[in-house]
Amino acid sequence: MIQEQAVPELAVSREKVSFLIEKAQEFDVKDLPVDEESGSNPTDDAEVDVLQDDSSDSLATEMASFMRALNEDEQIDLVALMWLGRGDGTIEEWEDLRTQAAERRNGYRNPRSETVRYLLGEPLLGDFLAEGLDRFGISWVDEAPTP
């Protein structure tokens, strides 16, 4: 007789992950900043306008502040959930993913900020978090996210 494995519990709430998914997807579809005074076209200047990070971006700042306010276990779960959604493991390997995420976080000089920077550096963060929740059998769109 085959026993079903219990689905692990997340330290971070569905509402918090849903909020981040929504914000990350908003961020992904934003218009890219353009330097109107550059005087060249994107092909000639190696598309540097596209590569520049606009640190004044309020959406990125909001996401960073929100993630920095999460506790250590919640941040670890976000990284592991992103990896799960990216296909770096399966739900059966959840504890291994969490352990790897904790080891990565503990290797940082400033774990809270560097974990946030790592997550924000993932171009498909919202999609991967949504897929990760889906692997848990959790829908992020059940209701409006209010963390």
Language-model-detected regions and their locations in the chain:
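Short coil/turn segments at secondary-structure boundaries
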Residues: 35-36, 80, 93-95, 143-147
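Polar alpha-helical coiled-coil and adjacent low-complexity
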Residues: 2, 62, 138-141
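Aromatic-anchored, charged helix-turn/loop surface patch used as a conserved interaction hotspot
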Residues: 4-78, 83, 105
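Long, solvent-exposed non-transmembrane regions
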Residues: 2, 25, 110-112
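Exposed alpha-helical structural elements
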Residues: 16-19, 62, 93-96, 114-115, ...
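Helix-rich interaction surfaces within compact, conserved domain-sized segments
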Residues: 104-147
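Amphipathic protein-protein interaction modules
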Residues: 71-116
